[in-house]
Each structure stands twice: as structure tokens, then as C-alpha cells.
Design a protein with these regions (language model features):
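C-terminal luminal/periplasmic domains and tails of membrane-associated envelope-modifying transferases
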Residues: 357-363, 367-390, 400-404, 411-549
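Signature aromatic-anchored transmembrane alpha helix within multi-pass, membrane-resident enzymes
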Residues: 225-229, 320-354
């Protein structure tokens, strides 16, 4: 009999090519311009600590931080925790920005999230020995990782979570858990997620021992995991992350932010697909499924159901479970199919790289009130200022120390935030609150662009009958009002407030047409309320044109 033919294999260059295309695709996906409001908080605080060689206590950036009384029992503790729990991350972020500029920051972010996806796929590859299962796991992780593509220290948390996962899977150099947690617990408070991994793998080893099948390295695992847990307390807050997680649930300020809302479960999404799909696979493969995978799944799925910001955990555990237990793909992919896979990935890579949002190595300057800040500096204005929450971080970076913030994203004062909410959302109560704080300057935009809601304070200020506030500056991003304009500054007519709202919404639609609700709220709320039917019709038409793209 003739010898059996050798199995056909793909050329040696194909897999490296596929890996390169996948990495380039992910880098392109995660490299949009710098636009997150909280980025500037980390840069400003990091710069201050780097220059002053101390933690930012007392707070140097907001003039309202220590006003009023606490609203819930742990508020002072939470404030102290928020001021110092990510000090190392903020300094490192500042140094990246100072050394590499916007390009360095964008590329660092893209590299961190790409590595998060890549290590997830690598763990699957180590488990299965299957190249394509690992690759698909990395791409599946990317579907959810897009939601964290912001310039915040938490991107390093998710990267370190996968690094820890790899250490626990390899079981080599478990001692690395100790320096990992020392670094991590000073970089960002998300290191508590690493404790979940320690618990899952140690729990698996303990259950195996009870079953009479002890793992060979269980003592080493327990020792270094315990030391890793203790190392998480080597930071300025010690083990403050534990009570802080409960304290956050008491805060109206935290719970008003979208990222702390529960994720919608009535919409099709990659999150639901990965969460439910991985559970189905666990049940289907229950005889093979590792106890650690069950424990990680229920812990991270539970966290993800509590807040949108935790959905990313499913981006790691979902692909890990799915592609660890589904049949290996390489066994069924013939060389022709592997070439087709590479061709498909090439098309996807080309689309990602040529996307308008790929490799935007810049700041989304259109979102920030640079013109208004220049006006304040030009006229040496440093009176107590009321600003919108979304701009607080940027003002810390660009307007401090001349102006300090009323509120910003650090969530430091609950009573001040509630007063802020009254001013921005309820114009009938606004003047009394502004008088209470002695505010002399208002720096405003017209909308909360995620929902499109119009800040009602603008409606009050557009009323010609109110004379306390004068419009002194307006462009397509911001408006500045003052009680007493400086010499040489001629107030603008109140009607220009509405012109400012129109200009802001038009500019937003040009840059971010996927969020067109400012046009909707002008058309179906503000202008009908003011009796301006022609303007209302115009903005409804703009909304329908943009929404229908």
C-alpha cells in the first residue's frame, strides 16, 4: 500500500501575517482622538503631584471641595480615597503626555487595550493549542474593549488583569503576583478585580483537594496568592478599596453617572452574546469546565450586571470560556479556508485603518472651551466660577490656577454636586443656589450630548428680563456670563444665548453625528417651549436628516 499522504499545512508566513493584521486592526480600533472628560483630571493631578512631590491633599483644584456637610456617612472617607487611590497612574499618565504629547497618549491607550485582547487570546491558545481559537478570542474581546478606549488609568487595570490571568495559568513565577499587586494597587483602584482571580484559582485548588485530586503546586499557589492579596494593601489607602466599593453605592453623585448605571438587558449586544454564550458553553461542557472558570464567570458576570463600567470583565472571561471549550478550529480549517480567513482579516484591517477614527493622534479640541478659557485669561478673571461637570477636568488642566472648578469628575462633595444638579437641571432654583455660593462667573455649554438634554439654565439666561447675568463671551463651544464684566468688556445681547445653542449643536452634529439628540431637544422641547416654531421645525428637520444617515 502506498504511504498515507501527509496532512496539508499552511505556509510558515501565514500565521505571523494574520497576527500582524489582527494587531494593526485592534490598534486602529482603539486609537480615536483624546476626548474623555476625565483624562484631563488625571493629567492635571499627575502634573501637580510630579511638581509638588506629594498627594493632592488638601484638594488644590476645586474651590467647593470642603464646603457644606456630608450627605452620607462615608462621604469624607470616599473623598479621601478618591484623592489618592490612583496617584501612580496619574503621574505616569502625565509623564506619557508630557513626553509623547497627544500621539503618545493615544498610542499608549491603543497598545494597552490591544494587549488586553491579545493576552486573552494567548491564554486561550495556551489552553487549546489552537491558533485560530486564540485569535477569535482576542477579536471577541475587542468587541467589548471598544467601550473602554479612553485615556484613563483603568485601561492599565484591565491589562494587568489579563497579565495576572496568564501568571495563574502558567503557574511559573507566581512570585510576580507580589510586585504586580504593589504596582497595581497604587496605579488604580480596580486591582480588587485581581483578588477575584486569586480567589477563583485558589478555590479551584481547594475543591480539587477535597475531591482527593490535589494540584501539585497548590501550596505555592496559596502562598503567593496570599502574599499577592496582602501586597494589594501597600498603597496610601491600605485596604480602603473594600469599604470604598460599598460607599460608592450610597452616592447620588456616582449613581447619576451613566457608567454606574446597570447595563440594558433588553437590547442585542456583544455583551449579552458573550455573557450568555459563555454560560451556555459552561453548562454544555460542564464535565470538562474548570472550577476556576465557573467561579470567575459568576463573579465577573455579577459585577457586570451592577454597572456599565464593569461590562469589560465579560470581554475577558466570555471569550476565554467560549473558545477554551468550543471545538478547536484549526482541525477543521483547511489551508484554503485559512487563506480565506487571512483575506477576510485583510479587508477588516483595511476598513479599520482607513476609518476616520483610526490613529487620530490628537486632542478632540472641538469639545473643549479653549476660547472661553483664553477670554478668562486675557481679562485676568479669577472670581468664583460655576462650570458644568463635563468640563471640570479640562478646566483643572487648562484654566488652573487662575480659575478653580465648582465641580469635576473626581466626585468629592455630595452636597455641592446636588446644588450643581439643581442649577444645571432646574433653572427656577438656579439663582438662589448661585447666590448661596457667591458665584460671579458662569462657564456653560448648552447640552448634555449623550442624551441631548438642554441645560435649562440657558433658558433663564436667554430671558431679556433677567439682568443679573451678562453674556460676555460666546463661540460654537461655550458661553461665559458674569455678574459684573471687567472694564472694556461690552455685554452681548441675551438673544445671542440662543444663537450660541444653535452654533453648539451644529458643531456637535458635524463632529459627532451619531449623537444627534441635541437637535431633537431643540426641536421638540426648547423652541416649542419658547414659541419659536420656525426654529423648532428647522431643528427637527436637522435631527431627522442626521438620525436617518
Amino acid at each position: 500500500m502506498p504511504p498515507a499522504p501527509k496532512p496539508t499545512t499552511s505556509p510558515s508566513w501565514l500565521k505571523p501575517l494574520i497576527l500582524g493584521l489582527a494587531a494593526l486592526t485592534l490598534m486602529a480600533m482603539f486609537s480615536a482622538e483624546i476626548s474623555d472628560a476625565d483624562t484631563w483630571i488625571h493629567l492635571a493631578v499627575g502634573k501637580w503631584m510630579f511638581q509638588h512631590h506629594q498627594l493632592p491633599i488638601p484638594d488644590p483644584f476645586a474651590w467647593t471641595t470642603y464646603m457644606g456637610k456630608s450627605v452620607y456617612p462615608d462621604e469624607y472617607f470616599t473623598r479621601d480615597f478618591n484623592l489618592k487611590h490612583e496617584w501612580l497612574g496619574q503621574i505616569i499618565f502625565y509623564l506619557i503626555f508630557a513626553g509623547g504629547g497627544p500621539a503618545g497618549m493615544v498610542l499608549f491607550r491603543a497598545a494597552c487595550i490591544t494587549a488586553f485582547c491579545g493576552i486573552t487570546g494567548w491564554v486561550v491558545y495556551r489552553r487549546t493549542g489552537d491558533f485560530y481559537s486564540g485569535l477569535l478570542a482576542a477579536l471577541a474581546a475587542a468587541t467589548i474593549a471598544r467601550s473602554i478606549a479612553n485615556d484613563r488609568p483603568y485601561i492599565v487595570t484591565y491589562l494587568l488583569l489579563t497579565v495576572e490571568l496568564l501568571i495563574l495559568e502558567r503557574r511559573r513565577a507566581l512570585w510576580l503576583l507580589v510586585p504586580l499587586f504593589i504596582f497595581w494597587s497604587n496605579f488604580h483602584g480596580g486591582y480588587f478585580a485581581g483578588w477575584i482571580l486569586l480567589g477563583a484559582y485558589c478555590g479551584e485548588a481547594l475543591i480539587d483537594r477535597f475531591r482527593g485530586k490535589p494540584q501539585a503546586d497548590e501550596r505555592s499557589l496559596w502562598l503567593w496568592s496570599g502574599l499577592g492579596f496582602l501586597a494589594g494593601g501597600v498603597n496610601p489607602t491600605l485596604f480602603g478599596i473594600i469599604p470604598a466599593m460599598f460607599a460608592y453605592r450610597q452616592s447620588f453623585m456616582q449613581n447619576s453617572l451613566r457608567e454606574w448605571h446597570v447595563p440594558p438587558l433588553n437590547q442585542l449586544s456583544w455583551y449579552l452574546a458573550l455573557m450568555l454564550g459563555s454560560l451556555i458553553v459552561l453548562v454544555w461542557q460542564r464535565r470538562r469546565a474548570r472550577i476556576a472558570d465557573w467561579l470567575m464567570y459568576f463573579a465577573f458576570a455579577g459585577l457586570s450586571l451592577m454597572a456599565l463600567r464593569n461590562v469589560i470583565f465579560i470581554g475577558m472571561i466570555g471569550p476565554l470560556i467560549l473558545f477554551s471549550y468550543l471545538p478547536p478550529l484549526e482541525r477543521v480549517l483547511k489551508p484554503a479556508a485559512q487563506y480565506a480567513f487571512a483575506a477576510l482579516l485583510l479587508v477588516g484591517c483595511a476598513a479599520a485603518v482607513t476609518s476616520p477614527k483610526a490613529f487620530q493622534l490628537r486632542v478632540a479640541s472641538w469639545k473643549y472651551p479653549d476660547g472661553a478659557i483664553a477670554f478668562l485669561k486675557q481679562h485676568n478673571i479669577s472670581a468664583p466660577m460655576f462650570n458644568l461637570y463635563e468640563w471640570g477636568g479640562y478646566l483643572m488642566w487648562a484654566a488652573w490656577p487662575q480659575e478653580k472648578t465648582f465641580v469635576d469628575g473626581r466626585a468629592l462633595n455630595e452636597s455641592v454636586f446636588r446644588d450643581y444638579w439643581d442649577v444645571s437641571q432646574n433653572h427656577t432654583n438656579a439663582q438662589a443656589v448661585l447666590d448661596k455660593y457667591g458665584v460671579e462667573v458662569l462657564l456653560l455649554e448648552g447640552f448634555e450630548y449623550g442624551t441631548g438634554n438642554v441645560y435649562l439654565l440657558n433658558a433663564m439666561l436667554a430671558d431679556p428680563s433677567q439682568t443679573k447675568w451678562k453674556l460676555v463671551f460666546q463661540d460654537k463651544t461655550a458661553m461665559v456670563f458674569m455678574r459684573n464684566p471687567p472694564p472694556g468688556v461690552q455685554p452681548l445681547p441675551p438673544a445671542r444665548v440662543l444663537d450660541g445653542l444653535d452654533a453648539q449643536c451644529a458643531d456637535h452634529l458635524e463632529h459627532q453625528p451619531e449623537l444627534p439628540n441635541c437637535a431633537l431637544r431643540l426641536g421638540n422641547f426648547l423652541y416649542p417651549k419658547l414659541g419659536m416654531q420656525q426654529k423648532a421645525a428647522y431643528w427637527m428637520q436637522r435631527y431627522e436628516q442626521t438620525h436617518g444617515r
